[in-house]
Amino acid sequence: MTSIARRTLLAGGLAVAAASLAPVALAAPAQPWLAYERRLRGLLADPPDGDFDEDFEQTLLDLNNLIRRREGAPPLAWDPGLAAAARAHAADMAVTERFDHLTREGYSPAGRVGLLARDLVGAPAENIAMRRNADGAVRPDQIMNQWRDSPGHRANLVAPSFTHVGYGVLRQGPRVIAVGAYAEVAARLAGPAPLRVRGPDEIARALSNAAPPIRQFSVSEPGGEVLTVTYVEGRPPNVLRPGAWQLRPHLSSGEHRYQLGWGPVFVLE
């Protein structure tokens, strides 16, 4: 289980100044991130030695919401971008035989969600499981019970702040690899953000019709916490170095107060 479901709080009038006092964020190299995105989309189109099981995935959602109802937590809604991130990681683990939240290259759930859920602003988390029964096919309740009986995984199942989920289940003969991608969705873009951009103004345009409105944002290295402030509505955008970045929108949480969310990964060319 992994979770980065956290948002940094900024005082509105001090948001730019406070972030500028932090160490300067560095862009990640662009080509590895572009290659990872291609790899994930290729796995979605052609899963290795098996197929994605949509019925299994939907049953996991039903079982998860049953657990949440018993705990007094609101139900989770299905999100196709989160489901894409979950499916892609399940297939990637099947290829690499590395069953972890981090790939060998160090790509995290935040990076996967940022690459594939391109209209989502939120705080992601992830559960993973692999199972092969001695007799009979693996069932959804067996995977859900594995997570329910693990404190860390259970925390993601019942976290009241999470609003959306996508499950990815790859069935390879008797083996099932399952991934749950969870998020507290704080905002939606009107459409998918572009992966490749020429400047911060293109990202600002992608945010222009977000709901609720996003009028300023920072960026970090994908999955990173060190920020560079690049845009405040009505001010000229700051210069940003080429490379891979992750959008960190400033979400209003009251008068003159903002929280930093997690948004799409983009490559500045």
Language-model features, listed with the residues they occupy:
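Boundary at the C-terminal end of the N-terminal hydrophobic targeting segment
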Residues: A25-A27
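A well-ordered secondary-structure block
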Residues: P109-E184, E221-P222, P236-H250
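Short domain-boundary/entry signatures in modular proteins, especially
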Residues: A183-G191
